[in-house]
Amino acid sequence: MAPVTKFSRKIYKGEVNNDEAAYVFDILTRYMNPKPEGSLKVLDIGSKNWAYVKGEYDFFRKYCDNLTLDGVEIDAYRLYANLYSRFEAAKFYIKNLDGVKYYADDLMNISDKYDYIIWLLPFVTPQPLEKWGLPKKYFMPQELLEHAAELLKKEMFIVNQGEQEAEIQQKLLDRAGLQYKFLGEVESSIELFKNPRYGFLISK
């Protein structure tokens, strides 16, 4: 995979919340039900520092003997206040997880096929992208969604923040002609977030 230009070196505050992995494990358990198989290949889109990777890993390992779990993040070189990048943090979180890889890359450069795809908080409006200082050319929600669908073999779980983003996401899904189920507000016994989140399950 081609390396991504290290265009983002901004520093921002905020330490990793270790409950993220437990939250992700919880919502995957509530909303996904993979069929047990010998091998599974899973993609996480927009992984950030991938602090929650253990939640995804533990969930999907229940359903297979051999798991390949890839994470892709276009803004992998953003710095924390401690001067460690997302990429460096992600390497720490995945170091003891077999079959897990983190790619500092653009989703559009990914060409492998995946049984399942997890996409938490995709950019469906330009404001978050601008807030993080990413070039405007990377705001292409329709193209990214359709490319993700091309990579998908079974199911994709998308989570959006707030009703407005969920409504936009639904329009993107309709425009792409994808088969999906709107899950409503995503519930979890682990309360980490102030704003409600909404989910979609896309199937092939």
Model-found features: residue ranges?
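Class I SAM-dependent methyltransferase SAM/SAH-binding core
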Residues: 43, 47-101, 106
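A generic alpha-to-beta junction signature in SAM-dependent methyltransferases
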Residues: 36, 63, 150-153
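Class I S-adenosyl-L-methionine
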Residues: 5, 9-14, 166-204
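A short acidic, Gly/Pro-enriched loop at the edge of an enzyme's catalytic core
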Residues: 105-118
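A short glycine-rich, Lys/Arg-flanked "PGG" loop and its adjoining helix->strand segment in the class I
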Residues: 131-154
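Class I SAM-dependent methyltransferase Rossmann-like catalytic core
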Residues: 1-38
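A short SAM/SAH-binding and catalytic strip from SAM-dependent methyltransferases
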Residues: 116-138
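Short strand-turn motif at the edge of the Rossmann-like AdoMet-binding core
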Residues: 122, 156, 160-164
